[in-house]
Amino acid sequence: MTEANSNRNRSKHARSHYGREELRTVRSVKRRTGGKNNYSKFTPMDNNESIVEESEDEGEEEDDEQEDPQPSSMAYDALLTLLDDESDHEQFHAEKEKALKKLEEEQEREEEELQEEDEDEDEEDEEINLEDFESDDESHDDPFHFHFNEEESIDRMINEYESSGLKVKMDRKVNHNGYNILEYLPSTSRCLNEVKTLDKLRIKKKLRDQFSSLDFKDELDKKLTLDIFNYKNINYQYYTRETDYQSLYLLHALNHLLKTRDRIFDHNNKISADPNLEFKDQGYTRPKILILLPTRNFCFNLMNKLIKLADIKTVENKKRFNTQFYSDFKIETLNGNKPKDFNEFFRGNSSDFFTLGVKFTRKSMKIYSMLKQSDIIFASPLGLKMLLDKEKNDYLSSIEVTILDKADGLLMQNWDHVKQIFTKSLIQAPKNFEELNCDFSRIRMWCINDQAKYVHQVLSFSKYTTPELNNIVKAPNLQGYALYKPIIDDTNNVMNQLNYQLFQSRIINKNIRLNHMFMRFPSSSPMESPKKRLNFFTKVILPNVLTKSPYTSGTLVYISSYLDYIQVKKHLSESRSEFLAVDEYTSLSASSKNRSLFEKGKYPIMLYTERMHFYKRYNLNGVRNVVFYNLPTDPDFYAQVVRQIVRNKLKDEELDLNLCSIKVMFDRFDTLKLEKIVGLKRASLLVNAEQEVFEFK
């Protein structure tokens, strides 16, 4: 919804609330040119856009009793039907664009009905007395203070950091409870202060009981908490570890918002007593926290956790939120054989289209606040990206903490949306200063000088990591960044766990084994890797599978990159090879037909994309050999695909597992993926050894 300029009276009120009423000349402004945002270095992914659902992302407050079904949900159902019934790619894309356009038109109509702006109704809530806030002493041992408010110290560090070419150094490597933690700091002579113990963290009084109730299981939990509250960038792989990291970052976000609010109100009172005082305590816009999530169900669960931690009795629009984000649908009721991670991801409302503002006032929490007036923005990358493309708004210009949760799910959707949000909108200088409703005299200097990237915190939480997730936390935060890597050894890697389970099930034994063959191809750079990979597949793997394998039919080729999939498909077509292919854009009827032909052995090869596996988890019949063209992004996919051979053995007793083969293609840039599958030590051996073929039985 395009934000109209507020009238002068309301602008004056907003400035008096968040800053001084009069607009004064800003002194000592050092706007820097150049200094391109480092987010532009992110590597794009090749994933494709998912089906979207209606969202009332900036709708204003309405009566909770009025909860009629939304027409766009019917459009979404129609769109899903199209996904099942389309006959080819062109028809699918045409129908998808038509449905998306319909969603946008319906959303615009809904927004027009909900344009009763809430500035006036919130004025009473925003007028706060001295008793309503807790003043903080600006202590040098408060991470919030020294990370955002010590402007002279911050400015010196930024100058030194930029002079070094934004170089970082490894500060230390620590081991806690099965995790290696790699900590990096800017290459500067001095660093910002850092709190070393939990009892020294300055938690707002309102949140201390919630913080004290957290279950810190071990030193790893304590270390993660300290890094979050010290404003470090973090890439945390929870992998198989059960921990309530969400409560940590939500309390951190609430603590940050309360400190920001109380500091501004404290300064307002001081200015009222002495109008000559000046304070720098704001950004261009109000939103301070951005949380990106893959589905509405994850957003629903997180919002309820936030409500509980905030301990606020009045939550406006909660019933409406429940209607639009909650569903009791359990996908496991359709097919109980799906893996646990599949059921968790697609449970409930799995729509990946939403943008939602949350605003805290004196006595309440408001869901569906206007984005420009929100404190926290919850969004899916697709929903936020489409809204930003439509509105060209600046409400992300002053975000101070960005959180990517279930980031592995974001990778499986369309990582390019995340990349564009970071490079084009997040902490970017406003495009239209005339539309800003702020007191420029109180905007922090690092914000005015386009240096927000040096204090902006990025937190990423995912099952596993990838170069994309590592890159996103390597942004130039003055506090540095920390990579949390689970230690994968010979006992807990995916391949050994799979073999142990098969041995316990008496499917394999000393005489019957599955042959895992890892084959390294030469590659000098990540840019060169796709070309070298295709060449290795066509010259080495394919001839071996077609002519030398004991089973010349039933070969499943698993491809994690869609671009690689297109190249392989093109090569096989041009060489007139007999093959089948199923991908995320294959119609339901074509997919069923191809899988049936493959099961009957009519075609020797079937190409199978990772995103197809992520969204469907098919049980494929007729699989005798597997070729991993790329290593799976999710390590569990390796075991799930290999089990396709085992399933067919259980159905066909004549199938000899000793004659089945599993071939894995990799190069020296696949270390992150290799670690989870074969373990850290073996991964290092596979990448660095002189020999290029490794066989595991």
From Swiss-Prot:
Similarity remark: Belongs to the UTP25 family.
Assembly and interaction partners: Component of the ribosomal small subunit (SSU) processome composed of at least 40 protein subunits and snoRNA U3.
Ranges of compositional bias, category Acidic residues: 51-68, 105-128
Molecular function in Gene Ontology: rRNA binding; U3 snoRNA binding
Subcellular location: Nucleus, Nucleolus
Residue ranges, compositional bias (Basic and acidic residues): 89-104
The protein's name: U3 small nucleolar RNA-associated protein 25
GO cellular component terms attached to this protein's record: nucleolus; small-subunit processome
Matching Pfam families: Utp25_C, UTP25_NTPase-like
